[in-house]
Amino acid sequence: MNKDIIIGIDAGTSLIKAVAFTTNGRELGISSTPNEYTIKSDGKATQSLELTWKNCCKVIKDLGNQFNNFEKRVCLISVTGQGDGTWLIDKNGEPVCDAWLWLDSRSSDIAKKLTNLESEEMRFIATGTGMFSGQQSSQLLFMETHHRETLDKAKTAFHCKDWIYYKLTGIKATDPSESCFTFGNFRTQEY
């Protein structure tokens, strides 16, 4: 059996999609399902890690049902997902709390204070990005002050796509562009 199918997964905030391609890039099939998130008046915007994973499994299964011998034909899975946010797991790989999404604004005061520091220009030059409340840096600082018990339980901070990759492989990893986005130098890819 030839391994002739590439799967692309996009774990978006409101929709999760999976697309099957040939190894030459021709689209073969697609599946999608809505993804749920919660927004509160205090700026809270969260999403269940478990539900996001369950929805990813659903779209992969639905996609697989479109092909014969799907499992044996897949040669590659690529994962992308919503940017920024904070997806925390404990030492056993279990979610500590719902993910703080990129549109969560609870840490906006912290982001504003960080933006006004003298070191902001140096940080911007290194990271190539402006500071905002949806980034892990400001969210983790907010948690340190207001949700210490949650942060104390956490062993790993992921972004959405890293969570999906972890669930697919059991490996805790990210790509250099993601890890350097708010905490490192994107030019040198150093953390």
Where are the language model's segments positioned?
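Active-site metal-coordination/substrate-binding segment of hydrolases
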Residues: 110
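N-terminal glycine/serine-rich phosphate-binding loop of ATP-dependent small-molecule kinases
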Residues: 1-97, 153
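Short beta-strand-loop/turn "lid" adjacent to the catalytic site in phosphate-handling enzymes
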Residues: 67-101, 127-134, 165-185
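Gly/Ser/Thr-rich active-site cleft segment
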Residues: 11-13, 123-191
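Carbohydrate-associated surface elements
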Residues: 104
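Hydrophobic or amphipathic alpha-helical targeting/insertion segments
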Residues: 91-95, 113, 117-122
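Secondary-structure boundary motif
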Residues: 65-69, 116, 145, 149
